Amino acid sequence: MTTRLDSRFADLKKQGRAAFVTFLMAGDPDLDTSLKLLQALPKAGADIIEIGMPFTDPMADGPAIQAAGLRALKAGTTLQKTLELVRAFRKADDATPLVLMGYYNPIYIYGVEPFLIDAKAAGVDGLIIVDLPPEEDAELCLPAIKAGLNFIRLATPTTDDKRLPAVLANTSGFVYYVSVTGITGAASADASAVSAAVTRIKRHTPLPVCVGFGIRTPEGARDIARHADGAVVGSALVDVLSRSLDAEGRATAATVPAVADLVASLARGVHGAAQAAE
């Protein structure tokens, strides 16, 4: 089974360049603006989109993404409405891979089986669930794969060669390498350390390796894209989004253009990396 993720990475490989992966929280700052933002991402140069599922206790998220989740929850965003957002996006874009990222609890409450049916029908391509280790694969990972979704696993600087095979066993789509330890948005990614880590992971898997956490500038994105199959940017986009809001935390006329402009400049960094590496 070839998924949208498989097709996108295959196309990018032919072009000799890395994927630019963007993250935004569903429903931030409201559902209408969230849809406009998602629609603007591919036009600005995003190859793959990660959509955050808002949750009340996001333990791996830094202040920017926590605040985004709170804004989304305040705007009434639920998992059901997140899937409706995906469905609305898919009306005009059937090619861009969409990956839902977040925590297991909202899916557990929704019900694993109905969630997987609804997610697949809406046009979701993959899941990144940060608080489900491989030991819990029977909970969601294996049913997700059976439903035709990619299950993307996180690897970190502390995931050693002994642990990696377990982490990678049921992973598909791509491997998400968290380049810095700690919460999102906290530190900058180091290109030489990333290069060594990507090489090490690739000894264990043929899957593409995307690198996230700590990428904030076009130069940083370019440096990572030289060594990885994809560069993921989230906190930097959420920061720009939050700075564009009014005093009440509502969207302004500047919100979508501000995010799209940053995406375009980061995309130029990622997409220019192939030429730098050749």
Swiss-Prot record:
Q: What does this protein do?
A: The alpha subunit is responsible for the aldol cleavage of indoleglycerol phosphate to indole and glyceraldehyde 3-phosphate.
InterPro entries referenced in this protein's UniProt entry, alphabetically: Aldolase_TIM, RibuloseP-bd_barrel, Trp_synthase_alpha_AS, Trp_synthase_suA
Q: Which gene encodes it?
A: trpA
Query: HAMAP family annotated for this entry?
Result: Trp_synth_alpha
Protein's recorded name? Tryptophan synthase alpha chain
Query: What EC designation does it have?
Result: 4.2.1.20
PANTHER family linked = TRYPTOPHAN SYNTHASE ALPHA CHAIN, CHLOROPLASTIC, TRYPTOPHAN SYNTHASE, ALPHA CHAIN
Q: Can you tell me which residues form the catalytic site?
A: E50, D61
| Keywords for the protein's UniProt record, in alphabetical order | Amino-acid biosynthesis, Aromatic amino acid biosynthesis, Lyase, Tryptophan biosynthesis
